[in-house]
Design a protein with these regions (language model features):
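Well-ordered secondary-structure scaffolds
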Residues: 1-215
Length: 215
């Protein structure tokens, strides 16, 4: 049997979480950003915004062709160029949109609020929001809920095993109320009977935030 920490070739890395776990999330506004113009397999986005176009934070940049998932701009600015950049996800150079960021970001383009918490409405809103997994595959969240198979449990993974990373931990503390705000609609749409929020036992402050949210 292979053991994750003691088998040959396995290494237990130090977490180094102390470097950032007590730091607040701050907004960093660079002079330019690079947004992939392809999906996680390297296929070009459909309906891609043209070079020279002005975009707003939250405006549509393009659509993934495989699952028809929209990709939105994280900033307000101008599409300056399409450049080839090495993609750690695709594993080769691919096209990226280079957006010059405006100093004044203005209002964000926001989606209309969820009108109903029935399954069809929630699935449609998850798709419209472009919500996907962050593990590299970019698998659309709406597909997980758009199933005929019974769903017993919604699992929210805040374990964050990777060294140095504390995004889930800090965001969980600062924005746990957003999680609980969304859960009723997700529970109704999925038909799940329970929710499990997974984290590590030593993440005391996150556990306290979760327990406070439950109370």
């Amino acid at each position: 049997m292979i053991h994750i920490f003691s088998s040959k070739g396995q290494v237990h890395l130090d977490g180094h979480k102390e470097l950032s776990k007590n730091e607040p999330v701050v907004e960093f506004m660079p002079e330019k950003v690079l947004i992939p113009a392809v999906d996680n397999k390297g296929v070009a986005l459909a309906n891609l915004v043209e070079v020279g176009a002005t975009v707003q934070k939250g405006s549509l940049l393009g659509v993934r062709q495989d699952f028809q998932i929209p990709v939105y701009s994280p900033v307000t600015g101008t599409v300056a160029a399409v450049v080839k950049v090495m993609s750690p996800v695709v594993g080769r150079p691919v096209n990226f949109l280079q957006i010059t960021v405006e100093k004044e970001q203005g209002e964000e383009v926001k989606l209309a609020p969820l009108a109903s918490d029935d399954k069809e409405s929630v699935v449609a809103k998850l798709k419209e929001g472009g919500i996907v997994g962050l593990g590299g595959a970019g698998f659309p969240t709406y597909i997980k809920y758009n199933t005929k198979d019974p769903i017993d449990t919604i699992l929210i993974n805040a374990v964050e095993c990777e060294p140095y990373l504390t995004t889930d931990y800090v965001e969980g503390i600062e924005r746990i109320s957003d999680v609980f705000l969304a859960l009723p609609a997700l529970l109704k749409a999925s038909g799940a009977q329970r929710v499990v929020i997974a984290t590590k036992a030593d993440k005391v402050h996150l556990i306290e935030a979760i327990e406070k949210g439950i109370a």
